[in-house]
Amino acid sequence: MAVSKFVQIRRDLHKIPEIGFEEWKTQQYILDYIGTLLNEHVEVKVWRTGVIVKVKGKNPEKVIGYRADIDGLPITEETGYEFASVHEGMMHACGHDLHTTIGLGLLTAAVTERIDDDLVFLFQPAEEGPGGALPMLESEELKEWKPNIILGLHIAPEYPVGTIATKEGLLFANTSELYVDLKGKGGHAAYPHTANDMIVAASHLVTQLQSVISRNVNPLDSAVITIGKITGGTVQNIIAEKSRLEGTIRTLSVESMSRVKSRIEAIVAGIEASFQCEAVIDYGAMYHQVYNHEALTREFMQFVSEQTDMKVITCTEAMTGEDFGYMLQEIPGFMFWLGVNSEYGLHHAKLKPDEEAIEKAIVFLDQYVKWKGTRK
């Protein structure tokens, strides 16, 4: 059975997921497609493994931006798709193949029927890490075409097709990676008094970290520390010289993130003293909260509800992390959830978004952009 042009594009992209700042095939695919649209009104820039496209308006007074993240995840796919990933151990398990496809669809509509204002499309690498939004925002390439308004979307498996969900103000949390390396003294399991066990030290640290949430964060605020991975030791009868904890920190407020990190550092210092070991903390990538511009979001929700076929839901904030938050620090705009009705959630090896959502998103976003970017 034949599929639509943009469903096919999504399937093409789904086959070639690549991790952050290694999206060379994805970048080339985007450039090849844009090459079919080029005319005197379209300009293209390459930034690292990303692409920035400008469509000149007929009588521009402002620049409207659309951001699509393009990277995949280090997950082995289990969808059973005929168009499953051909890159072993990598998958588009967060919907960035849909985000990119919708961006290309919106770009196609913009080239076909130009509006008054300029449009800029940001095909951004490395959202899943180490973070592409902030360096792209600071790049010379984008500074020349910096939008006055910017929007982005994220697929939502829990919402039905034909639905969007968003809210004014805080939408997504502040997030930070967390890595703690502990180094003590290894030894024979029969002589624990001559060694310094970093498995035991790591176990104490994991337990103590949870007290930060229950005793150091305002209960009316929200924060989560998750340790998702612990490594240490070599065999069962050798006391481990080293251990490593890997996790994430998520807070709704910026103030809580600072407080949580301060307490983590104090607890780790206590572990060093208690177990006579050395500890190193690395926070890795940190993403700023996604805070939607109130007036623009309210206007967008009203427009979509009254003038399109989409259903609009006012959702609650989520502990999800998104580096789009950095763009919203600098540029007024908003992000919204796009319903794709999947049994399996984000970052799951069996995530299967309903492809019907692609065309619906292109259509209603094109309606919104034309309305927002055309003088009445």
UniProtKB/Swiss-Prot annotation:
Q: Where is the active site?
A: D69, E128 (proton acceptor)
| A matching Pfam family | M20_dimer
Q: In which pathway does it act?
A: Amino-acid biosynthesis; L-lysine biosynthesis via DAP pathway; LL-2,6-diaminopimelate from (S)-tetrahydrodipicolinate (acetylase route): step 3/3
Q: Which GO terms describe its biological process?
A: diaminopimelate biosynthetic process; lysine biosynthetic process via diaminopimelate
* Keywords tagged on the record: Amino-acid biosynthesis, Diaminopimelate biosynthesis, Hydrolase, Lysine biosynthesis
Q: Does the keyword Amino-acid biosynthesis apply?
A: yes
What EC designation does it have?
Answer: 3.5.1.47
Which Gene3D superfamilies did the record assign? Answer: 3.30.70.360, Zn peptidases
Output the Gene Ontology terms for molecular function.
N-acetyldiaminopimelate deacetylase activity
Enzyme class, top EC level, equals hydrolase
Chemical reaction(s) catalysed: N-acetyl-(2S,6S)-2,6-diaminopimelate + H2O = (2S,6S)-2,6-diaminopimelate + acetate
Q: Which family does it belong to?
A: Belongs to the peptidase M20A family. N-acetyldiaminopimelate deacetylase subfamily.
Q: HAMAP family per the record? A: DapEL (MF_01692)
Tell me, in a sentence or two, what this protein's role is: Catalyzes the conversion of N-acetyl-diaminopimelate to diaminopimelate and acetate.
Please identify the protein, giving its name as recorded.
N-acetyldiaminopimelate deacetylase
Q: What is the lineage of its organism?
A: Bacteria, Bacillati, Bacillota, Bacilli, Bacillales
